């Protein structure tokens, strides 16, 4: 196969990987963690992935600690965790 053909194949495989939705087996383990506001008293509107409902939901984050199932935007949550 020519180098141009290899580059085309690599490009197509990369595009396929980017566009393929996340499946539950590919989902990071932290997506299964519950929402966790943490002990601080801030009022940050963020999103977490609810594995029971299979969707990203908003919650209030206090600003410290918590866990990794915490996203600034719903888009970031969906790209990382939603199938």
Swiss-Prot record:
The record lists its disulfide bonds as 31-81, 40-64, 56-77
Q: Origin, by domain of life?
A: Eukaryota
What PROSITE patterns does the annotation carry? Answer: BPTI_KUNITZ_1, BPTI_KUNITZ_2
Task: Tell me the leader sequence span.
Answer: 1-24
Which tissues is this chain's protein expressed in? Expressed by the venom gland.
Task: Give the matching InterPro entries.
Answer: Kunitz_BPTI, Kunitz_BPTI_sf, Prtase_inh_Kunz-CS, TFPI/VKTCI-like
Please state every residue range assigned to the domain named BPTI/Kunitz inhibitor: 31-81
Where is it located? Secreted
Question: SUPFAM superfamilies this protein is in?
Answer: BPTI-like (SSF57362)
Just give the chief location class. Answer: secreted
For this UniProt record, the keywords arranged alphabetically read as follows: Disulfide bond, Protease inhibitor, Secreted, Serine protease inhibitor, Signal
What single Pfam family name could you report for this chain, choosing any that match? Answer: Kunitz_BPTI
Alphabetical list of PANTHER family matching this protein: KUNITZ-TYPE PROTEASE INHIBITOR-RELATED, SERINE PEPTIDASE INHIBITOR, KUNITZ TYPE, 3
| Role played | Serine protease inhibitor.
Q: Which family does it belong to?
A: Belongs to the venom Kunitz-type family.
Protein name, per record: Kunitz-type serine protease inhibitor nigrescinin-4
Q: What organism does the record attribute this protein to?
A: Cryptophis nigrescens (Eastern small-eyed snake)
